[in-house]
């Protein structure tokens, strides 16, 4: 029997009783998050769908070797659980990342995400034109250039001009990935090239990140 255990579980067999308990304790790794009222979460083949007052978000987690389920606890509250077997350190980190994505999806369909960006310039004022559809922005006169920069927003995002603060725009949406990617594309369209960036600080930068205060 000892020979069989040594061949099948060599690392466990050589450990002390306390180490065997730790190994058995980490045999199954489970994390969970609560689902608030008014939000519906469904899972099908590791494709998570979250529905809330602001809309619906869908994300595919098939690349993660995990069991994602929607269950109810002893108090009758709904929660999403993510479970892994024989999980190592990196796999446990990936599982917590999946749960963070689901939390962001729940926040997106209940509150929404809002990023604010400011225009920074020294000599040439940056002019921005936002159409009524609020699905793109046209940037003009950056560093005095005549070229017009057209930046479309990601799906589900809208851009508006902040009338309370000068040279500030607001990007809103339910998906934090799409909102942040829209800001990154605006920032990337106004990069200073072939100049000393320590001296030429012109550009459009993210000044504030958060959620939409007025819930729908």
Description of each model-found segment:
Residues 2-216:
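Ribosome-associated RNA-binding proteins
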